[in-house]
């Protein structure tokens, strides 16, 4: 397990996917994806506690299965969900997860989702706050090229909307290998 090798530093981002063709290529009925996802996640969390485990569910049935080595964090491996925030998804995340990775970068989308997820955490009796990790909206310069500097200017607004952890992918901005260093230096400045 990657979590065991990294001494408990793994954080797992999970989601259902939206492309029906991907499911069809795998021989999985698209309409069953939600059931499969949540049942699979429950199975994984049980396996992470140690085994063997047996499971008789709607989608899967098995007996005496092991997962070794178990994650250093056990069942509490941080789970961040890349889903559209709905009350149903928020309730499920509040039961088993740690946070949300918004699938859109708009501040309105993030803010509305945060309100729903915060309420679900309260309803579940949790005292911790959900983690919200996402990207800034990519801003283009006057030539239509993605600009790291303009994008980073959106940081405060996105954090005000509810993002607490920001992911910046240099590949979105570096126009050449030579440009990569400049992009990385701009990103490094936000830590100061």
Predicted regions and their residues:
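Active-site-adjacent structural elements that line small-molecule/cofactor binding pockets in enzymes
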Residues: 1-192
């Amino acid at each position: 397990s990657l979590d065991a090798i990294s001494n408990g530093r793994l954080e797992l981002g999970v989601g259902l996917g939206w492309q029906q063709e991907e499911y069809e290529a795998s021989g999985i009925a698209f309409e069953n994806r939600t059931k499969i996802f949540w049942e699979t996640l429950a199975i994984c969390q049980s396996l992470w506690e140690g085994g063997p485990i047996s499971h008789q569910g709607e989608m899967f049935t098995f007996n005496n299965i092991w997962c070794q080595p178990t994650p250093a964090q056990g069942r509490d491996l941080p789970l961040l969900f890349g889903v559209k925030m709905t009350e149903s998804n928020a309730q499920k995340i509040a039961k088993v997860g740690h946070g949300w990775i918004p699938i859109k970068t708009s501040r309105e989308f993030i803010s509305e989702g945060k309100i729903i997820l915060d309420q679900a955490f309260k309803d579940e009796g949790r005292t911790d706050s959900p983690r919200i990790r996402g990207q800034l909206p990519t801003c283009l310069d006057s030539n239509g090229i993605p600009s790291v500097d303009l994008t980073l200017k959106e940081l405060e607004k996105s954090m005000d909307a509810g993002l607490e952890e920001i992911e910046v992918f240099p590949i979105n901005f570096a126009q050449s290998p030579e440009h990569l260093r400049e992009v990385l230096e701009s990103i490094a400045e936000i830590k100061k």
